[in-house]
Amino acid sequence: MENSEKLTNSKEVIAYIAERFPKCFTIEGEAKPLKIGIFQDLAERLNEDEKVSKTQLRTALRQYTSSWRYLHGVKAGVNRVDLDGNECGVLEQEHVEHAHKALEESKAKVRARRKEQAVAKAAASKDGEAKTNKNHAKSPKPKNTKPKTSKLNKKPADTSRALTADEVKVGNDVLVNMGSGNMPASIVEFNKDDVRVRLTNGLTMVVKMEHLRS
């Protein structure tokens, strides 16, 4: 049996349907608004396809239509398209306004989260500096003139920073804050606040965007 392995995540499903229906779906650039009822059309076209289930299609469509690049494409005067790229009517103003509102709310959440992270990082840095100065004042003077290496120097400074919204892209390398330190990983899938990453040991996990750093 040729290439019959079942797809495992929404990213793979979106890539697959974009390959099957290139005039309707795209994996990069601005997406086209989809025909109302496109799920039913997809389910019928792929009914005999063992690689993808209806549940996977529904989840992938939800992620696809809530992505920033899809919401950017929902504009006044633009036509919806079916699986074959045929126009299916101009977008209604109500749908355009809804998409614009959803996009702005999503971006506002990212901006607020980045601001909170910056404030928390600044507070932690200030607190750490105060503790360092306090410990330094209590330390006895060395009995010899040989320079003494501070234990703090043994731990490299954290030069990571919070991700910007534009850096949250599939394939980008990031650092995942695991509490005890940052772990290198790469983004394999994202949907608003949740991001699926793959660690260097091959383990995949879903984390919140605030736990990702660059």
UniProtKB/Swiss-Prot annotation:
Span list, region Disordered: 104-163
Keywords: Chaperone, Cytoplasm, RNA-binding
Compositional bias annotation for Basic residues: 133-154
GO terms of molecular function: RNA strand annealing activity; RNA strand-exchange activity
Disulfide bond entries: none
Record gene name: proQ
Cross-referenced NCBIfam families: PRK04950.1
Stated family: Belongs to the ProQ family.
Protein's name in the database: RNA chaperone ProQ
